[in-house]
């Protein structure tokens, strides 16, 4: 069990103690807000032209793949789950098992700062359900309900 004390903002090196993901698949740069009582978390992803997915999505017109925005929301939910359970990245792996009501409203491009707001709806045993919105400049660019389950 982890006994770390985290002060906001939580930086990427601390996030790496909570999530098993690493470059190029760690999609959370900073935790800005966290309320474990209301199960609410806000995180940031700085979208850089140096992201490896921009090489092929799309050449000369880079757009962040929507599925990676959903993955980023799930990772933010994972941070909250680990903090809420007092665990670290190695305690138990969680996998995305379901996505519902995914919506993509606007393209995310290099230079954007993605702000992800995630609300945990429930956590029963090893299954967490979240609703998340990703925003750029205050405008919702993507949203989804995500379910993650711990590995057995």
From Swiss-Prot:
Listed GO MF terms: (3R)-hydroxyacyl-[acyl-carrier-protein] dehydratase activity
Protein keywords: Cytoplasm, Lipid A biosynthesis, Lipid biosynthesis, Lipid metabolism, Lyase
Catalytic activity, EC: 4.2.1.59
Active site: 57
Principal location class: cytoplasm
GO cellular component terms attached to this protein's record: cytoplasm; membrane
Gene3D superfamilies xrefs: Hotdog Thioesterase
Family designation: Belongs to the thioester dehydratase family. FabZ subfamily.
Name under which the protein is recorded: 3-hydroxyacyl-[acyl-carrier-protein] dehydratase FabZ
